[in-house]
């Protein structure tokens, strides 16, 4: 990936989606325990693998899979869990998802901090941070894909007109 702007947005997109996945993983491991740790390691590392695949091969399949992965994380973890279950609850709105435990004032967790209030604050806070991270991931994914699309159009025009030729 030689385009510096695309590289910048690819890096920002990768950082934001990986941080969102890390926050969401800590959120769910805190609640459910270490049983899902392998799944979350895959979820955290997959975007890095896809971006590396793209930088080495330039294939559109890597970008398509990376975009699909981002959409699934943003929609599933960011919007449904982070926004509908935790952010709206923190803002005082009623429970709006079908997620288990979402209607509870205090969700039972496997791990605990120094007090139940601190544990609940950590759990709800990481849910809200998952939503915030997904907002950044959405913006940077859009910028990354848009930059790649503009680069592709520019390259196609150069191929049609050739270097140094005046375009019609």
Where are these regions (language model features)?
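Membrane-helix interface and helix-disruption motif detector
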Residues: 28-38, 88, 117-125
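Cytosolic juxtamembrane helix at the C-terminal end of the final transmembrane segment
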Residues: 137-162
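Juxtamembrane non-transmembrane "cap" segments at the membrane-aqueous interface
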Residues: 80-106
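Transmembrane alpha-helical segments of multi-pass membrane proteins
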Residues: 14-18, 64-80, 162-168
């Amino acid at each position: 990936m030689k385009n510096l702007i695309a590289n910048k947005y690819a890096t920002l997109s990768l950082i934001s989606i990986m941080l969102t996945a890390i926050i969401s993983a800590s959120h769910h491991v805190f609640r459910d325990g270490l049983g899902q740790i392998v799944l979350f390691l895959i979820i955290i590392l997959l975007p890095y693998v896809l971006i590396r695949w793209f930088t080495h091969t330039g294939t559109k399949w890597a970008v398509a899979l990376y975009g699909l992965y981002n959409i699934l994380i943003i929609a599933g973890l960011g919007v449904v869990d982070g926004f509908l279950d935790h952010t709206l609850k923190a803002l005082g709105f009623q429970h709006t998802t079908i997620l288990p435990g979402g209607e509870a004032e205090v969700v039972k967790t496997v791990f605990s901090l120094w007090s139940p209030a601190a544990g609940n604050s950590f759990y709800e806070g990481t849910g809200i941070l998952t939503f915030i991270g997904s907002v950044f991931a959405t913006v940077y994914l859009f910028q990354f894909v848009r930059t790649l699309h503009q680069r592709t159009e520019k390259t196609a025009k150069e191929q049609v007109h050739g270097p140094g030729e005046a375009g019609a």
